[in-house]
Amino acid sequence: MPHLSPMSWITSMLMFWISVSILFSTLWWSNNYLFSSKMTNCAPKSLTPWNWL
C-alpha cells in the first residue's frame, strides 16, 4: 500500500497555501479596484484598509 510520505505532505500543504494566497490576493486586488473606482468620494481614504499597509 502506498503511504503519504512527509515530503509529499509538505508539498501538498505548500501547494494548498499557495493557491489560497493567490485566491485571496486576487479577491483583495479586485475589491481594491472596485472600491477605489466606485466609492472613492463616498468614504474617507483613511478608513480604507489598503491604505494602512
Curated annotation (Swiss-Prot):
Q: Where in the cell is it found?
A: Mitochondrion membrane
Keywords attached to this entry: ATP synthesis, CF(0), Hydrogen ion transport, Ion transport, Membrane, Mitochondrion, Transmembrane, Transmembrane helix, Transport
User: Transmembrane region positions?
Assistant: 9-29
Query: Main localization of the protein?
Result: mitochondrion
GO biological-process terms attached to the record: ATP biosynthetic process; proton transmembrane transport
GO CC terms in record:
mitochondrial membrane; proton-transporting ATP synthase complex
| Keyword NADP applies | no
Q: Topology with regard to the membrane?
A: Single-pass membrane protein
What protein family does this chain belong to?
Answer: Belongs to the ATPase protein 8 family.
Q: What is the documented function of this protein?
A: Mitochondrial membrane ATP synthase (F(1)F(0) ATP synthase or Complex V) produces ATP from ADP in the presence of a proton gradient across the membrane which is generated by electron transport complexes of the respiratory chain. F-type ATPases consist of two structural domains, F(1) - containing the extramembraneous catalytic core and F(0) - containing the membrane proton channel, linked together by a central stalk and a peripheral stalk. During catalysis, ATP synthesis in the catalytic domain of F(1) is coupled via a rotary mechanism of the central stalk subunits to proton translocation.
Q: What is the annotated quaternary arrangement, including any partners?
A: F-type ATPases have 2 components, CF(1) - the catalytic core - and CF(0) - the membrane proton channel.
Q: What is the official name of this protein in its record?
A: ATP synthase protein 8
